């Protein structure tokens, strides 16, 4: 759009320049000379803009897309010139605001995105479900046509030859043509570039392919028009190739990812992979580079040589120290992996990454980025991926990355963990992790089925106890656990979802304790912030019983323990108090232990102390031969049988996560923003819209 050129309040004339195709020249002249209204061109990029809004979370369904279209200039022009925008009279009869027309436009754009593999579109409800490919398209400014091309042609077996061909098919180059006077030079370039080009010189894709390889090879061009086209191609090359890298990673194509990443780095560095990595350092003498490349000495083995040996290798003794410094400034990482199976199909890996190179701000900048890939035994499938960013201030520290990865059945002999530099060619380390001596856990028992029982009335607790509660019947989970908790003295492990009423189940065990002779009970909560609310709630619930929270001093805690009926504490507090259990009879006389949120046994901070406290409680009971009951309350567990065995629970009620008193509807919206403040901003609006809707 050409606005008013010059300074209208001072000048009488102004100049503006429009660069366009010759076929469009008369159109722009008519706009200026006849002062026609500027028409909207939004329809041509509607699908791509809709995709960007969906990825942002602004638009989640067709109705929101209709509302969004109402804010556009396209909508204004459709109201003013309906015939020009194919708005038939049928739309305007009972719909002055063109809601149906906008719905049809949104529907058409959604169908285009769905065909390109960027969207799942439910035509009945109008719901849009985005994916990683849509995010890549939006972040790299790729059209849905280009993404459809990549979706169609990109395979797990694609080689560098095929990747260059796919690159040349991009919609960004649709206006590129092969001129008659360019054919001879393109033919010469096809013979000079290292990667073969299948297409003939008359096809635009061959021209695009040849120009990209010419750019990497740093070859000179003769034609001015061809040089201009190469600038256009190379300006988009890095962006498109980086998008191809992410597409391959998301799809799990291990080998194709390596090819695409190498092509992207070759384009940015303007050197081929067969050249020495020394070319990536600025200001290195060309003679030094040529001598090193003629030797064909493996780059990785240079780290084993001393400066004088490097000088002898290239035939320039005085350059040995310079070469040694450059070799040890080249990004290199050491890896160590520790792994253990969580289940028969899930492996937890703790990866220790140690930088082993000299950091130079002029060369490495403020940070270096690496791709972390876990590949299968054949190196064909990416099982896990992430990005590791090494900051300058942590360049000498060890870094630990923890992640989980799927274990396939049958168990493969090994996996491969790779770290590939995002910017440096040949900066890669690969670590095999062998499963030869890996011992898998037993298969887990199925969850306890939720029975369709008649709800148990609270009157079974007695009139006095029932009057303390605001409800008169138990839910299904409480009803099924009632017999084990209230009518027996057996230890019980109860696993149920959040909101299932597990605290009431703990209170059933307390009522059982006091109805059968009394005794002291201890409730262990994982976090200190949970203690005081529980104490206040139980003081109101059991006014005749003394409920206390432990303090920070041992002497005070001993006095509280002596006078308390119920003690509420964290694992750390009870650990300190119970260590000298042989000298403390009040610790020995505990008749009931309630371990809440027992699933946090696997937590890195709470878990070890929690496990020690539970094990010591059982040890004390075994040594003193006092009857002690243990109640474990937890979220649904896969290995509930193992936890019950550790706790000494003779009855295990481990319900599935879906066994909820109140059904829960789950909506998953992924976010892939590594920067935490940016992630919070990106999640704010979708979270607000979800709260307002549900």
Each language-model region and where it sits:
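Conserved segment of the helicase C-terminal RecA-like domain
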Residues: 2-32
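SF2 helicase catalytic motif II
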Residues: 571-575, 582-624
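Conserved interdomain linker/interface between the two RecA-like ATPase lobes of SF2 helicase motors
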Residues: 21-24, 615, 629-694
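Conserved Walker A/P-loop ATP-binding site and its immediately adjacent core
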Residues: 503-504, 519-540, 575, 635-640
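C-terminal helical accessory/scaffold domains
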Residues: 53-54, 93-94, 98-102, 107-288, ...
């Amino acid at each position: 759009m050409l606005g008013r050129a010059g300074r209208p309040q001072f000048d009488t004339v102004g100049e503006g320049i429009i660069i366009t195709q010759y076929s469009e020249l008369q159109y722009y002249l008519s706009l200026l000379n006849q002062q026609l209204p500027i028409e909207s061109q939004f329809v041509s990029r509607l699908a791509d803009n809709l995709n960007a809004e969906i990825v942002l979370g602004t638009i989640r369904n067709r109705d929101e897309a209709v509302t969004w279209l109402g804010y556009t200039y396209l909508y204004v022009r459709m109201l003013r010139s309906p015939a020009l925008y194919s708005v038939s009279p049928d739309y305007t009869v009972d719909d002055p605001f063109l809601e149906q027309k906008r719905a049809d436009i949104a529907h058409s754009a959604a169908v285009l995105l769905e065909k390109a593999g960027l969207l799942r579109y439910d035509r009945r409800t109008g719901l849009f479900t985005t994916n990683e490919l849509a995010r890549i398209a939006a972040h790299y400014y790729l059209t849905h046509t280009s993404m459809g091309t990549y979706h169609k042609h990109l395979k797990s077996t694609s080689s560098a030859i095929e990747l260059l061909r796919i690159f040349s098919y991009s919609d960004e180059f649709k206006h590129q043509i092969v001129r008659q006077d360019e054919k001879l030079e393109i033919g010469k370039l096809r013979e000079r570039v290292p990667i073969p080009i299948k297409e003939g010189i008359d096809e635009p894709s061959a021209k695009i392919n040849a120009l990209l390889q010419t750019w990497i090879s740093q070859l000179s061009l003769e034609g001015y028009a061809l040089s201009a086209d190469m600038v256009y191609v190379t300006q988009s090359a890095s962006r498109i190739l980086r998008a191809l890298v992410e597409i391959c990673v998301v799809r799990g194509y291990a080998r194709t990812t390596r090819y695409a990443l190498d092509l992207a780095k070759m384009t940015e560095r303007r050197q081929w992979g067969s050249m020495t990595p020394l070319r990536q350092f600025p200001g290195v003498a060309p003679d030094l580079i040529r001598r090193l490349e003629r030797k064909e000495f493996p780059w990785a083995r240079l780290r084993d040589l001393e400066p004088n040996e490097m000088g002898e290798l290239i035939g320039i003794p005085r350059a040995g120290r310079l070469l040694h410094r450059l070799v040890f400034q080249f990004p290199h990482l050491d890896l160590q992996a520790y792994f253990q199976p969580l289940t028969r199909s899930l492996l937890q890996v703790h990866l220790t990454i140690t930088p082993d190179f000299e950091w130079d701000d002029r060369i490495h900048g403020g940070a270096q980025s690496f791709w972390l890939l876990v590949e299968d035994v054949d190196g064909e499938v990416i099982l896990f991926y992430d990005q590791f960013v090494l900051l300058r201030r942590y360049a000498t520290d060890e870094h630990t990355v923890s992640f989980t990865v799927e274990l396939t059945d049958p168990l493969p002999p090994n996996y491969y963990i790779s770290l590939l530099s995002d910017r440096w060619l040949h900066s890669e380390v690969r670590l095999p992790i062998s499963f030869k001596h890996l011992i898998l856990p037993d298969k887990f028992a199925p969850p306890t089925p939720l029975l369709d029982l008649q709800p148990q009335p609270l009157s079974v607790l007695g009139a006095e106890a029932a009057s303390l509660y605001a409800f008169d019947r138990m839910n299904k989970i409480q009803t099924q656990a009632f017999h084990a908790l209230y009518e027996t003295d057996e230890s019980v492990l109860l696993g149920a979802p959040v909101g299932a009423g597990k605290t009431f189940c703990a209170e059933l065990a307390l009522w059982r304790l006091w109805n059968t002779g009394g005794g002291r009970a201890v409730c262990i909560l994982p976090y200190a912030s949970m203690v005081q609310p529980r104490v206040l709630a139980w003081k109101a619930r059991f006014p005749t019983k003394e409920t206390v929270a432990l303090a920070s001093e041992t002497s005070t805690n001993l006095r509280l323990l002596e006078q308390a009926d119920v003690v509420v504490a964290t694992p750390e507090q009870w650990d300190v108090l119970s260590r000298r259990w042989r000298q403390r009879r009040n610790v020995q006389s505990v008749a009931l232990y309630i371990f809440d949120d027992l699933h946090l046994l696997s937590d890195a901070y709470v878990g070890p102390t929690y496990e020690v406290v539970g094990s010591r409680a059982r040890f004390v009971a075994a040594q003193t031969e006092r009857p002690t009951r243990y109640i474990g309350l937890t979220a649904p567990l896969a290995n509930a049988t193992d936890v019950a065995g550790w706790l000494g629970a003779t009855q295990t009620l481990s319900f599935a996560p879906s066994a909820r008193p109140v059904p829960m509807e789950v909506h998953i919206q992924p976010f892939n923003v590594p920067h935490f403040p940016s992630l919070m901003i990106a999640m704010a609006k979708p979270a607000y819209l979800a709260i307002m809707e549900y």
